[in-house]
């Protein structure tokens, strides 16, 4: 067998303008294409003026004509890209249907797109098998993990980290989900919701269209729009600044189902850091009492009713008023039992 001194003498190979093709010879169109490398049957075989492209694998960048600085490694990677630039596709069918710029897809079927609609959204990052698989117009998304954001079509500026994270989102934007199946538990999976932050495996929003919910902790679920949820239903204590304590600012509180939404003076009843001004007590006012270890609110009208129900001072400790052999008499601060013989009007 003769030794080849030039690559061009090999069947299905071409060296031209600092470019190299092995596996096919597209010499009829490559006169103005510079500094590219292709390895594989039909890899980069339609190029005309595009430069600095790299294609490895059958049908990799096969429709590229004028785009520059693309890297496609794997069967049908960046297959339908034709005129756009600065894409990286590594893995079987990664960015297969794309004709957008600035995307990075690593993993089989990562950002693959659909056969009916070309990918137009750019500047996305998809790492993991089927990550951002069905994306079409969505832009500036980051999906890391198998099937993360797999059903996104037009949502923008989302970040999903973890297997299946934010998988059911289609059009929601500005969401951040971190953790295995975060926002993808099968209950209230985010689809169109926006501005949500879910951190922890199996975290969920309160609704598929939930908005501005912050949910932190394994298995925790958002409760409402514009709310923060810390921990799941098994959490029994929440510490601020570890065990040192911290100042918590809030316009109101709900304690055991009872709302406290008034002034700082009325909220801060423990240390008295803010003093309430004196006021005239009315029947509708309420006081806080300890009922056998449980703090309860009692209306002043109820206090008045109780005090009024006391018919004698015997309810007080070391006190006696009236009674047999003690007519119209009052004794306070002394033994009240024993013999009280005809002690009247004392």
Where are these regions (language model features)?
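Glycine- and small/polar-enriched repetitive beta-structure motifs of secreted/surface proteins
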Residues: 5-252, 309-346
């Amino acid at each position: 067998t003769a030794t080849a001194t030039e690559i061009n003498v090999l069947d299905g190979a071409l060296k031209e303008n600092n470019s190299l093709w092995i596996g096919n010879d597209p010499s009829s169109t490559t006169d103005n294409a510079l500094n590219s490398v292709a390895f594989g049957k039909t890899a980069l075989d339609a190029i005309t003026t595009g430069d600095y492209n790299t294609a490895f694998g059958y049908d990799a960048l096969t429709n590229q004509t004028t785009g520059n600085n693309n890297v496609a490694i794997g069967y049908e990677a960046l297959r339908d890209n034709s005129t756009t630039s600065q894409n990286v596709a590594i893995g079987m069918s990664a960015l297969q249907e794309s004709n957008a710029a600035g995307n990075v897809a690593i993993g089989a079927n990562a950002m693959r797109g659909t056969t009916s609609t070309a990918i137009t959204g750019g500047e996305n990052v998809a790492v993991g098998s089927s990550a951002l698989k069905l994306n079409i117009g969505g832009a500036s998304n980051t999906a890391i993990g198998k099937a993360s954001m797999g059903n996104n079509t037009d949502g923008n500026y989302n970040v999903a980290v973890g297997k299946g994270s934010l998988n059911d989102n289609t059009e929601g934007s500005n969401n951040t989900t971190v953790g295995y199946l975060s926002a993808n538990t099968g209950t209230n999976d985010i689809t169109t919701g926006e501005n949500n932050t879910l951190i922890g495996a199996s975290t969920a929003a309160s609704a598929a269209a939930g908005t501005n919910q912050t949910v932190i902790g394994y298995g925790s679920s958002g409760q409402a729009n514009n709310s923060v949820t810390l921990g799941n239903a098994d959490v029994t204590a929440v510490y601020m600044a570890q065990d040192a304590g911290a100042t918590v600012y809030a316009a109101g509180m709900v304690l055991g189902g009872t709302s406290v939404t008034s002034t700082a003076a009325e909220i801060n009843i423990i240390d008295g850091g803010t003093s309430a001004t004196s006021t005239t007590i009315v029947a509708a006012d309420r006081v806080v009492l300890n009922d056998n270890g449980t703090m309860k609110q009692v209306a002043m009208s109820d206090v008045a009713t109780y005090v009024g129900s006391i018919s004698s001072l015997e309810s007080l400790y070391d006190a006696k008023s009236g009674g047999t052999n003690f007519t119209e008499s009052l004794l306070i601060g002394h033994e009240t039992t024993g013999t009280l013989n005809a002690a009247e009007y004392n």
